[in-house]
Amino acid sequence: MASKEILFDAKAREKLSRGVDKLANAVKVTLGPKGRNVVIEKSFGSPVITKDGVSVAKEIELEDKFENMGAQMVKEVASKTSDIAGDGTTTATVLAQAIYREGVKLVAAGRNPMAIKRGIDKAVVAVTKELSDITKPTRDQKEIAQVGTISANSDTTIGNIIAEAMAKVGKEGVITVEEAKGLETTLDVVEGMKFDRGYLSPYFVTNPEKMVCELDNPYILCNEKKITSMKDMLPILEQVAKVNRPLLIIAEDVEGEALATLVVNKLRGALQVVAVKAPGFGERRKAMLEDIAILTGGEAIFEDRGIKLENVSLSSLGTAKRVVIDKENTTIVDGAGKSEDIKARVKQIRAQIEETSSDYDREKLQERLAKLVGGVAVIHVGAATETEMKEKKDRVEDALNATRAAVEEGIVPGGGTAFVRSIKVLDDIKPADDDELAGLNIIRRSLEEPLRQIAANAGYEGSIVVEKVREAKDGFGFNAASGEYEDLIKAGVIDPKKVTRIALQNAASVASLLLTTECAIAEKPEPKKDMPMPGGGMGGMGGMDGMY
């Protein structure tokens, strides 16, 4: 085991503090509408230019092990805030730096760090409650667009596209961000249920120009198992042929004799039929087949329910107004399922989302929910170069997360004003002792820091701006984009309350833990070994001195 280096007291805190400052100073230049970009070297490809706090934080690794510990702790603040709220990473980093910086001074002066932490915790609870009291719900598409615009660095195009996407797919809908092939940023909305499985044979195509298969008013068969034998399918095919309607077969797979027979019947015109593989794998596939069956008003054919394919009748099949299938995707539009069945299924999926602890499972459940109730919107981000594309895509994802948070918990005045407005509640807290009071005062001072930094990045004196905002009436604040003091909610300078709350809670949590650190342990760097002397020279080559 490698030997360790141990630092105590002020020495440990000084090293950690240096690491915190190095990371926070790199991140905080991006804060606010006039924040600057950071360029990051990559080991492959062109450098990345970004204004996203968490992207900057993730790139920072410091040479000194103790400084790096401080930096990694603040990186945790940014990452956690990004994971939960999706935005507000720079604000969280600025708050963490301010809380730790103020706290270190007090601990060095002999204050009790544990009591300071208690004071910080009390202050955060009070401020969080006050933020809830000044929160306004997002009322319309315009406010959603404003949140997106602010988060996307005042890009109104991005804000408007996100608001439009949310209006079309609803709160439960899935909105994804992809790279566009052109320069324009566009929105593509898929109505109905779409899954990533295409036709099993190109012979099923009904529109050779577009290479798609379009079925109007088809029956839909959902089968859990692989279909290989024609004998199993014959009864249901005969029933569908009698009513002269198209048929979509969704199964684990259709192959061999069964697939060949379907293709021959399609080519002869005896039956308009298409076979596609079921989406997903394992238990998730089963759940998605059940979703499709409920959406279309049919019954999924599962062996464990005692239903066999050869016994299926038309009443077990689902129907939809239209189905479009291409090489890679199937879209079912306007399924004929009963609304009460769909609502019950939605309720069940929501309960599973609440219960699951896996982020991956939650994401997949939300996708299923969106396909049942809302729809799927895809924002295609366009740019002239790959570097600009990456930077713009980061901003779109931030803005999307911010708007979701705004819809979820409402909005507060932006630009750091909500924090300054909340300072007054700290006067009502009764601290147990002077050390707890010191903890309250740390939060009192730190809550001004985001506004100071936004003002500084815009070229204004932070202290003067903070004083003016504090004296102004409720709702009024500093608009760094225009340099005006105005009603920020009317001006559209708004932040999601969830982002503001999570940023403060995470910053206080990590910074107060760092304050209570009395000892830091890291691996000793291995001493560099001197390079050995090179081997002997080129002896035995005498007699060449006459050569020029």
UniProtKB/Swiss-Prot annotation:
Reaction(s) catalysed (UniProt annotation): ATP + H2O + a folded polypeptide = ADP + phosphate + an unfolded polypeptide
Instruction: Provide this UniProt record's keywords sorted from A to Z.
Output: ATP-binding, Chaperone, Cytoplasm, Isomerase, Nucleotide-binding
| Keyword Acyltransferase part of the UniProt annotation | no
Q: Name one GO molecular function term.
A: unfolded protein binding
Asked if the Swiss-Prot or TrEMBL record annotates the protein with the keyword Chaperone, the reply is yes
Q: Name one GO cellular component term.
A: cytoplasm
Instruction: State any GO BP term from the record.
Output: protein refolding
Residues holding ATP: 30-33, 51, 87-91, 415, 479-481, 495
Compartments where found? Cytoplasm
**PROSITE patterns from the xrefs?**
CHAPERONINS_CPN60
Superkingdom, taxonomy of origin: Bacteria
- In the Enzyme Commission scheme, what number(s) does this protein have? 5.6.1.7
- InterPro entries with a match to the protein in the record: Chaperonin_Cpn60_CS (IPR018370), Cpn60/GroEL (IPR001844), Cpn60/GroEL/TCP-1 (IPR002423), GroEL-like_apical_dom_sf (IPR027409), GROEL-like_equatorial_sf (IPR027413), TCP-1-like_intermed_sf (IPR027410)
Q: Which Pfam families match?
A: Cpn60_TCP1 (PF00118)
Cystine pairs annotated here are none
Can you tell me which family this protein belongs to?
Answer: Belongs to the chaperonin (HSP60) family.
Q: How does it assemble?
A: Forms a cylinder of 14 subunits composed of two heptameric rings stacked back-to-back. Interacts with the co-chaperonin GroES.
Functionally, this protein is described as follows: Together with its co-chaperonin GroES, plays an essential role in assisting protein folding. The GroEL-GroES system forms a nano-cage that allows encapsulation of the non-native substrate proteins and provides a physical environment optimized to promote and accelerate protein folding.
Q: Per its record, how is this protein called by name?
A: Chaperonin GroEL
Question: In the UniProt record, what gene is named as encoding this protein?
Answer: groEL
